[in-house]
């Protein structure tokens, strides 16, 4: 019997709706990966509603929970760590210590960092010290880095002006330590407005992928969290980087189609679960000669 992969997912949780672990854990489990959720915050709902209740997990709880898993002899079974929204820079440093602890018992374990830096215009608020931590510390530890365009620009200290510029900026991030950079959403000047574009860059190759951009009255939250989780899960299931890239784009598109059909602000993960596992659509990533 083929072994089921395990990963530790350390990011936010919302009681209502889908963001952070609430967007990523179920889809990862649905496609065959045993996700262990460790929630950095527990909020009533995501912050783009403009009001919420809840609290941030005390940073000391992260190593305590990792230690608890170690004490029952299960930490060595962890194949990867995924981190996303952080409530504080202290949480981030606790996560890096956890990654180090896991890699000590499983050197093959991967660390995917989704460097959520916030988007104040959309109501996504991240403390300034978190962005500084991500820029200065997390990128050097990550095996897989999954920024969006805003975060890519922040890492590189300038705004991308073209697709080629995005590729070069992603390559510059590889020099900090990651094996691969997945840019979840490209937003460079001159791109096709009716297309949603993504980029995957390794030391050897770069791939560009387009899918239709679906219209919503309000853009659903949690798409990036879903993207990072599915990509890491497919890698753990044996996909190559580009296979995981293509699968993720298709599965996320299926979720968005169902969400659009339901006229919902929240991702329709349960309704779309079979399409997540077996997408009906396929988008081919184009190898770039750049």
Swiss-Prot record:
One GO term (biological process): pyridoxal 5'-phosphate salvage
Enzyme Commission code: 2.7.1.35
NCBIfam families, alphabetized: PRK05756.1, pyridox_kin
Pathway(s) served: Cofactor metabolism; pyridoxal 5'-phosphate salvage; pyridoxal 5'-phosphate from pyridoxal: step 1/1
Catalytic activity: pyridoxal + ATP = pyridoxal 5'-phosphate + ADP + H(+)
Pfam families assigned to the protein according to its UniProt record, in alphabetical order: Phos_pyr_kin (PF08543)
Domain of life: Bacteria
Binding site for substrate: 12, 47-48, 225
Gene Ontology CC terms, in alphabetical order: cytosol
Function: Pyridoxal kinase involved in the salvage pathway of pyridoxal 5'-phosphate (PLP). Catalyzes the phosphorylation of pyridoxal to PLP.
Membrane-traversing stretches: none
Gene3D superfamilies: 3.40.1190.20
Residues that, per the record, bind ATP: 114, 151, 184, 211-214
Family: Belongs to the pyridoxine kinase family. PdxY subfamily.
Signal peptide coordinates: none
Keyword annotations: ATP-binding, Kinase, Magnesium, Nucleotide-binding, Transferase
Known partners and oligomeric status: Homodimer.
GO molecular function: ATP binding; magnesium ion binding; pyridoxal kinase activity
Named cofactor requirement(s): Mg(2+)
Protein name: Pyridoxal kinase PdxY
